[in-house]
Curated annotation (Swiss-Prot):
Coiled coil: none annotated. GO terms for biological process: cell surface receptor signaling pathway. Gene3D superfamilies: Rhodopsin 7-helix transmembrane proteins. This is Latrophilin receptor-like protein A. GO terms for molecular function: G protein-coupled receptor activity. Residues 1-15, 63-70, 135-152, 218-222 are extracellular. It comes from the Eukaryota.
Amino acid sequence: MPSQLLNTVLSYLTDILLSLSIVGSFLTIFTFMLYPKLRSYPIKLIIYLCMSIVFSLFFFEISFRSSNSLFCIPAAILVHYFFLANFFWTFSVSFNFFQMIVKRNRDSEFYERYYHLISWGIPFIIIIFCAAFKKYVDRGGFCYLEDQYSVYFGFFMPGVIIVCSNICIYVFVAKEIYKTLRHTPTQKRQTVKEFRVYFSIFVSIGSSWIFGFIYMFSDSNSIIGYIFLILFSISTSLQGFFIFISYCLNYKVFAHYSRSFTQYGVSFFKRWENLDGETTQSGPTGTTDSSSTMTSTTTTTNVYSA
């Protein structure tokens, strides 16, 4: 397949998948902001993760459209920042799950301030260093870090730390689930379900990091380069959509939306019935008045006739 045609197909595919992911992340944020009763503390962390996904994908798309423009460098900085924030929020979500299952910490919300410091603060420090040494450039098709060393220390190394940390966390959590919850089937099923969701999110984001890193160090015009570019585009673009399916397509969310639409529908029909009733009442009144007027006119005519 000609490279030009492949680039065109990949561009359209990426745009579609990016749109799905952004819409999925936005709907997840919207749903849990709309219904506070569904917004548990772990869900709050998922909302922050979705925010980082929305911004990272948005500026990722902008970076490909900002080549040879004044917005190229700012787009490169923002892409780098929000992708790093994306990685660090997966760590925060995983560590919070570790606190609940392994440590059985009832005050896990105490750590939220530290999650924010880690997930927003460390990426900020990294991009400050990269920007200070002018490592963001236009790479001829998109805007990102200048060379392999910048990618290695500014993107790969933080990713390695996060991926290794998350692997250790999920190993401990899996062992704890197997060891302590085997005698409580109901609770086990729910916890295993949560574990699968969290682990799937980690795999999705971790795989995009791996594919993106390999693509950065491969020949972009080779078959291997194209393969990893496609894998990176797909895995990156479906993160938000996967989270939406995992957290919003369930009975509780459907029940809340159904209740809201039912209440809105009942309220709408009540207003319509009241309006229809007022119209019906005004009809007979108008007829009576008209009849009275006609009677009065007839009487007056008869008097003058007499």
